[in-house]
Amino acid sequence: MAAKIRQNDEVIVLAGKSKGKRGKVTQVLPNGKVIVEGVNIITKHEKPVPALGKEGGLVKKEAAIDVSNVAIFNPKTNKADRVGFRFEDGKKVRFFKSNNEII
């Protein structure tokens, strides 16, 4: 099945502690999760690694969100939207379901 949410898509979070926030997808994981820039920030405790020159301490980073909890953001309607697939000129393309515009 083709991915409805892909890397560099602008998405909006539908559920969870980051509900309503928008961001760009930085990574799509194979287990059905996505990492969104600036969303679902966690604080991780890291040990120092002197051999690599890494300092220890508290590090803030983005955690993965299930793909069902995000929706693609449609800039024309300024709302979350659903994605459909269709063939145009022999190529499979994604489009917004609300206004039939190609993504």
Swiss-Prot record:
Part of the 50S ribosomal subunit. GO terms for molecular function: rRNA binding; structural constituent of ribosome. The lineage of its organism: Bacteria, Pseudomonadati, Pseudomonadota, Gammaproteobacteria, Pasteurellales. GO terms for biological process: translation. The gene is rplX. This is Large ribosomal subunit protein uL24. GO terms for cellular component: ribonucleoprotein complex; ribosome. Belongs to the universal ribosomal protein uL24 family. Keywords: Ribonucleoprotein, Ribosomal protein, RNA-binding, rRNA-binding. InterPro entries: KOW (IPR005824), Rib_uL2_dom2 (IPR014722), Ribosomal_uL24 (IPR003256), Ribosomal_uL24_CS (IPR005825), Ribosomal_uL24_KOW (IPR041988), Translation_prot_SH3-like_sf (IPR008991). The keyword RNA-binding applies. Disulfide bonds: none annotated. The keyword Oxidoreductase does not apply. Pfam families: KOW (PF00467), ribosomal_L24 (PF17136).
